[in-house]
Amino acid sequence: MIIAAGLSPAWQQILEVTSLETGEVNRCQSAQWASSGKVINVGIAVRHLGTPCETIYPAGGFARELISSELEQLGVSSCVIPQQTPTRVCTTILDRSTGKTTELVENAQPITAEELAAFKTEYLKHLKSAQVVVLTGSLPAGTPSSFYRDLIAETHCPVILDARGPELEAALEEKPFLVKPNHEELERTLMTELADTEALIKGMQQINERGATWVVISQGKDTLWATSREHVYRFTPARAEVVNPIACGDSLAAGIAVALHRGKPVPDAIRRGMAAAADNLTQLLPARLSETRMQTFYDQIEVEQIA
């Protein structure tokens, strides 16, 4: 089983417009609502890839029942921690004239110490059956930056961590198996500009030296890099039609987790994660993956060991 755990789910609105004009009235071609946020996206993606997964998250307000109901319809096993404050609502605007995506992201509401304790209790209960864990998403205001670190300290199996800044730095002490900040998040964590490929790889290997077995940096349609202490890999992504980029990073994490769960070596797991991200890019709703579609993208991805 895979565990997807995180504190920042969202109830997501996806709007399609012919041409977005700021400061004007914009009428939408279509409007969709979906369960989302990193932890939810990972759970949905893993389920679509046919692997058992428990999705652990807090939720409150009107969105709690909506998210729970949709996950049940999708066949996603979940454990929801009741939260006093309402779950955030985020909006994605897809401009079909330019292909650009505009994100209106509400920050997650603070979560109480009692709710965090309940979350950890459920995590530890389900951990007994887990072979891979994905810890993902920003921490709500007031949550200790050590929260992910403390969960990793209790975890006996490989952990994929999608976090940044203080929570990533703290978690490195417990040696997560794989971390996947984006380029900007890595710069923020290291507090330095990574202006070229050489600087980027050196920055990634600093994170390896500080505890992460693998570091993965995706850059959208550009090269993805992966490093361990001994090796550097360059991956050239597949070409895919852009419909909605939301949850591509989460699909990458889910694809890697599923491949590791199936015993694949890390470079191949990353390749399969990239195929999942490419498939997600072509879908309107987040993380609704198909292994059949993914195979086409998998075959296009180029992998080169640099060191």
What is each stretch, according to the model?
Residues I3, E54, V134, I160-D162, ...:
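Structural detector of well-ordered beta-strand residues that form the stable sheet scaffold
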Residues R27-T87, Q300:
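Substrate-binding N-lobe of the ribokinase-like
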Residues R47, I152, H261:
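Gly/Ala-rich phosphate-binding loop of Rossmann-like dinucleotide-binding domains
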Residues I93-S129:
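Conserved phosphate-binding/catalytic loop of the ribokinase/pfkB sugar-kinase fold
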Residues S129-P140:
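Short acidic, glycine-rich surface-loop motifs adjacent to enzyme active sites
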Residues E169, T197-A307:
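Conserved phosphate-binding/catalytic region of the ribokinase-like
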